[in-house]
Amino acid sequence: MELKGKKVLVVGLGKSGLAAALFLRRRGAQVTVSDIRSAEALSKDIPALIEQGIAVEAGGHGLLTFRRQDLIVVSPGVPLDTPELVQVRKFGLPIIGEVELAARFLKGKTLAITGSNGKTTTTSLCGAILERAHQHVQVGGNIGLPVIALVDDSRDDGWSVLEISSFQLETTERFRPGIAVILNITPDHLDRHGSFENYVAAKERIFAAQTHDDALILNADDDAASRAAARASSRIFWFSRNRVIRQGAFVHEGNILFRAAEDAATEPILPLSEIPLKGAHNVENVLAAVCAARLAGVSAEAIRDAVRDFRAVEHRLEFVAEIGGVSFYNDSKATNVDAARKAIEAFPGGIHLILGGKDKNSDYRTLRPLMAGRVKAVYTIGSAAEKIMTHLDGAVPLIAAGTLDLAVNLAGGAASPGDVVLLAPACSSFDQFENYEQRGQVFKDLVLAHRGAAAWQNASA
């Protein structure tokens, strides 16, 4: 893909948009960045862009700016129904995303992981396993560095391990990972995609360019993910907690096993008891990583050692502290209902659950069966609070806390020794926080302010 002298517009100046703009400029393109945010809001990044000869359009998108380009690169946070994109698409102007741009230049082998939940943990674990096998590994995508920022350091003999979201997949065309993983597909981001069917279609783009030379790893226990097999040209491998798999990774008699082919011998990998991560969903994440790593040629011994040493990723069912016999867990990354369900299922009972944030057109009623005998009370926060309380009315005691600060204080004060205070919001964070990371950090700060106390001490009014 020749970029020198081409007029390229980058739409959206988030982390990936900024990285894409700088990459394009280094490759000789005439780059413009367009963002709906004001120049004041973008003041941190504008000077560096101008210094590199990149033009900046702030405070809105101009249709003429879009029409003057040879190529448009869309950041994942920008909806494809943005009016200016809809208009220029009619003229046949190429529109791709940052991941697709990177895929045209990335060297070496690619392992790409998507799913509604578990992406970050599985991606991080796969990276750790490949590093344990002394491979040259870069990890990025929807976590850490944008994919485009990995290009310059990529090597023909190396691996790029990528977490890829549905937003990123929407704008892919030739993105072809040698190994692709779909962990699960449950309703999420319906406010963006419009329907579950559209969301599934976006997820399935991860294997759209694959051939029979490539591998696709699917969750045999997840209906939507497993149905993807019928639409794939790839070699299919499976993972399952619940059944023996002919080709892939599975659990049998308390051990994780792997079978490379239907007629191959079964290889023992490690006992479930040696997985350091909490929750059945993390067994699935480990199974997916085991399958991917064996297909990448990593030995069972290296996989076992890496899994044993792996620790929970921040904001993902992260243990924060025990205060007065009460355990506090931060699962701020549980930004949808299915993720919250898996967090709740990780504990046998005694849960004081903090739910809420910005609604994503979710159905919280699916949590009702989990409440009896497991959740002592729900503390609602954010703009979704009223909807959550309506959906869970009568299933569990409900406390309208409003803010995370008050929710933590109320839950900490009500919990008894042996109980758990769990932040698993089932919502995005953007109504009260910059992102889920900030929400999780605030939760941890609120909890740790009480560390060392014999019992929870509520803040004074």
UniProtKB/Swiss-Prot annotation:
Protein known as: UDP-N-acetylmuramoylalanine--D-glutamate ligase
Gene3D superfamilies (alphabetical): Mur ligase, C-terminal domain (3.90.190.20), Mur-like, catalytic domain (3.40.1190.10), NAD(P)-binding Rossmann-like Domain (3.40.50.720)
The protein's role, per its UniProt record: Cell wall formation. Catalyzes the addition of glutamate to the nucleotide precursor UDP-N-acetylmuramoyl-L-alanine (UMA).
Binding, ATP: 115-121
PANTHER family (alphabetical): UDP-N-ACETYLMURAMOYLALANINE--D-GLUTAMATE LIGASE
Signal sequence range: none
Pathway where this protein functions: Cell wall biogenesis; peptidoglycan biosynthesis
Compartments in which it is found: Cytoplasm
Source species of the chain: Acidobacterium capsulatum (strain ATCC 51196 / DSM 11244 / BCRC 80197 / JCM 7670 / NBRC 15755 / NCIMB 13165 / 161)
